[in-house]
Amino acid sequence: MSAFTPASEVLLRHSDDFEQSRILFAGDLQDDLPARLDTAASRAHTQQFHHWQVLSRQMGDNARFSLVATADDVADCDTLIYYWPKNKPEAQFQLMNLLSLLPVGTDIFVVGENRSGVRSAEQMLADYAPLNKVDSARRCGLYFGRLEKQPVFDAEKFWGEYSVDGLTVKTLPGVFSRDGLDVGSQLLLSTLTPHTKGKVLDVGCGAGVLSVAFARHSPKIRLTLCDVSAPAVEASRATLAANGVEGEVFASNVFSEVKGRFDMIISNPPFHDGMQTSLDAAQTLIRGAVRHLNSGGELRIVANAFLPYPDVLDETFGFHEVIAQTGRFKVYRAIMTRQAKKG
């Protein structure tokens, strides 16, 4: 997180305008500009645990991680700089939350890549903070307005749900596969053996569908779920509760908050961070799994067939198997043996 994103580079063109401002940074915070920009005061709120990790090291308690921002998170701020995410419902959840807390008269800046759909911010905020485009560079747009009316925000209205084979899946904006089970997860689920026992870790759990589907056929497994996303953590908790499944769910940057070892680690790892393609999380997952698997334990992941995971699996575990595949996806299995690097 040392190099600035294109969106931050656009903001830096206006850095003189922010020197006297008390700024709340929010949205898709993929670099540490909130900690480095010269301002009168800076706060940051994020729903992404890995972004909070970076910012909190430099900003301390002025960087906050949660699903819903509170009045304390925006205290004394007179300016919002919002980084538009690729997911419009996610932007609506976050902006309605933040604008319901900030005082009328707050300066509102929205910045984002054109391909992310940032221009739709104008319509979204038209009734609360009419926006005008004030800059365009690096294939990004920067919009400015002033808060004229606070929206009414009710987080409960953003919840959704769908059913998969009789299971109830609870979802929130920003959660992967919010509108239904994705093809990759379906393929991974098809490989899970009924009546499995032991401790299972679901990394990048999303809405929790892998775990509840696994638990239905293997009720004796002991589940732990983690994700970098606050909406995913809350959605997984709700999905487990809706299906009467027990499990521990918490925020973690891959294994950063995970303790202990498991008999099986399952994952449909992400390869996008915001608008950027990133293999870091999956490679960290594969390499770190050996420190969290019992002897004979198994890592089982699904990934797009074109992604270069076989080499990392072989380098880490000594070997791997492809146990299911389609034209687009492969399910990989690697076993913790003496060949595996112990990290």
Swiss-Prot record:
Listed result of changing D227A: Strongly reduces affinity for S-adenosyl-L-methionine. Reduces activity by 87%
Pfam family, one: MTS
Chain's role: Specifically methylates the guanine in position 1207 of 16S rRNA in the 30S particle.
Subcellular location, record wording: Cytoplasm
Subunit structure: Monomer.
Enzyme Commission designation: 2.1.1.172
Domain of life of the native organism: Bacteria
Transit peptide found in the keyword field: no
Cofactor(s) needed by this chain: Mg(2+)
The keyword S-adenosyl-L-methionine appears for this protein: yes
Enzyme's top EC category: transferase
InterPro entries (alphabetical): DNA_methylase_N6_adenine_CS, Mtase_sm_N, rRNA_ssu_MeTfrase_C, RsmC/RlmG, SAM-dependent_MTases_sf, Small_mtfrase_dom
Transmembrane intervals: none
Origin species: Escherichia coli (strain K12)
Keywords (A to Z) from UniProt: Cytoplasm, Magnesium, Methyltransferase, rRNA processing, S-adenosyl-L-methionine, Transferase
Reactions mediated catalytically: guanosine(1207) in 16S rRNA + S-adenosyl-L-methionine = N(2)-methylguanosine(1207) in 16S rRNA + S-adenosyl-L-homocysteine + H(+)
An MF annotation (GO) of this entry: rRNA (guanine-N2-)-methyltransferase activity
Gene designation: rsmC
Any GO BP: RNA folding
Protein name (record): Ribosomal RNA small subunit methyltransferase C
GO cellular component, one term: cytosol
Family statement: Belongs to the methyltransferase superfamily. RsmC family.
